[in-house]
Every structure is written in C-alpha cells, then in structure tokens.
C-alpha cells in the first residue's frame, strides 16, 4: 500500500514517519481511519 500521514504523525509529511496506509475503498476490517480530514482520495488507515 501507499504510506500516508496520520493525524498522530504530525502536521506535515516532511520529517515525519508516515504510519498510515492509503486505501481507496475504505479501511479494511480491523483497521481504523487515522486522519480526520482527507486525503482527498481514499482513506488513511492504520492497524
């Protein structure tokens, strides 16, 4: 999957660990959405 920035990672992608994974069809079972706003396409999810 494509890494993405969770809210807990910090405000920007620069210098922060991207702990989420981008899912286009929503978060799979056992995962949760870790970003309140965006990304524009898909959902940023983590286990």
From Swiss-Prot:
Its main location: secreted. GO terms for biological process: regulation of signal transduction. Pfam families: Toxin_4. It comes from the Eukaryota. Belongs to the sea anemone sodium channel inhibitory toxin family. Type I subfamily. Binds specifically to voltage-gated sodium channels (Nav) (site 3), thereby delaying their inactivation during signal transduction. Has a heart stimulation effect on isolated rat atria that is higher than that of Hk7a, Hk8a and Hk16a. This is Delta-actitoxin-Aspp1a.
